[in-house]
């Protein structure tokens, strides 16, 4: 009975459910990344940091759609592009971690050296900043890196988006 009521609600207001699910999953994904970084002290590589941006975009898009109470085809296309770009970035990062492709210049250090510093200051700057390689995952759970979990999550989001868009609407 509860499941039937839930399914009827989803059929009736599928776009509100889509936005709420996207916001919730994005917050959970970002929270997981920040907990790993700031509580467990795993330093993210540059690609790991870039993989957070699509979730921030999904939160902004979904909140905007909820506030204006309108979800048109352009909003759905923007959500689709955001999730697809996250899939592409996660796939590339996974390939870099597994050695299938070479890391690009994006994977270089995020440390910027100001002009006019002495060698001692530059050494001190490098040794005080943790540098993480894009080729070595910081965490692996069951042999799968966080990047690959991110890819799986984004594939699930694509499937969910497809179900919301193409599942027959209720006539009630």
UniProtKB/Swiss-Prot annotation:
The protein's topology relative to the membrane is:
Multi-pass membrane protein
Q: Does the keyword Cytoplasm apply?
A: no
Q: Name one GO molecular function term.
A: protein-disulfide reductase activity
Where does it primarily localize? membrane
What is its subcellular localisation? Cell membrane
Gene Ontology CC terms: plasma membrane
Question: What name does UniProt use for this protein?
Answer: Uncharacterized protein RP370
What is the native source organism of this protein? Rickettsia prowazekii (strain Madrid E)
